Amino acid sequence: YGSCNPCVPSVDLSLQGIIDFTVPAGGSNGKAIHLVALQDIADLSIYGIGVANNGGGTDGQEYTFDAISVLAGDQILLARSPSDMALYFDSCYSQFDHVLTATSAISQNGDDAIELFLNGSVVETFGDINVDGTGECWEYMDSWAYKSAGDSTCLGGNWIFGGVNCTDGTTTTYNSSCPYPLCPLPSGCTDSLASNYDPSALVDDGSCLYSVTFNVDMNCE
């Protein structure tokens, strides 16, 4: 109050994952951007996305979010093909609170930087808009990048990566070599010798059961 400085809006939305899956349908159907709401947002349409292709600098805001409200902690998936994402994420798809259909502007090829806009101004950037990401530490071709501490050298140590081409030839995130970090790994018995072996389980939960054979000597002598 009484200040001549304009109010600076808080940034209540954040990039969480940049996705370039190789889904069975192919094409652009595996492209998506994962975001998380840091606070309640009454109108998501004040935010937008831009894809800076091939190191050519900013392309400005190319996508504007729908005018919906979201709650703090909500996981938001902006996907070129929600139906293909539902199949590829399998049971993990339910982890997303909102799934929005993206326009063709969401066109990242695994070597493109991403800009998050608020009221037309850039508030967060993944990658370097002036650098083609091919061969860079932040390349995510046919893979994903996910915001999490772990890599001490790339992008300030704030992102981890699935590994280039790690989703090629797979049908779900769970049968790839790089399950998406948001997704709880299926648990069950992982021992193929057990009677209740679960081939879909990736984490052994200690539930394995084994058949026991008894040899009974019926000789009464």
Tell me the role of every PLM-derived stretch.
Residues 7-55, 106-109, 217-221:
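A structural motif detector for short, solvent-exposed N-terminal "entry" segments of globular domains
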Residues 61-87:
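Intrinsically disordered, low-complexity Pro/Gly/Ser/Thr-rich segments with frequent PxxP/GP/PP motifs
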Residues 46, 98-176:
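Conserved beta-structured recognition patch
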Residues 37-43, 52-57, 81-85, 118-122, ...:
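Acidic glycine-/aspartate-rich tracts in secreted/extracellular proteins
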Residues 1-14, 165-221:
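Primarily marks secretory-pathway-exposed extracellular/lumenal segments that are disulfide-
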Residues 14, 32-36, 48-50, 75-79, ...:
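Residues within well-ordered beta-strands of beta-sheet-rich folds
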Residues 38, 65-69, 105, 137:
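Short, surface-exposed secondary-structure edge patches
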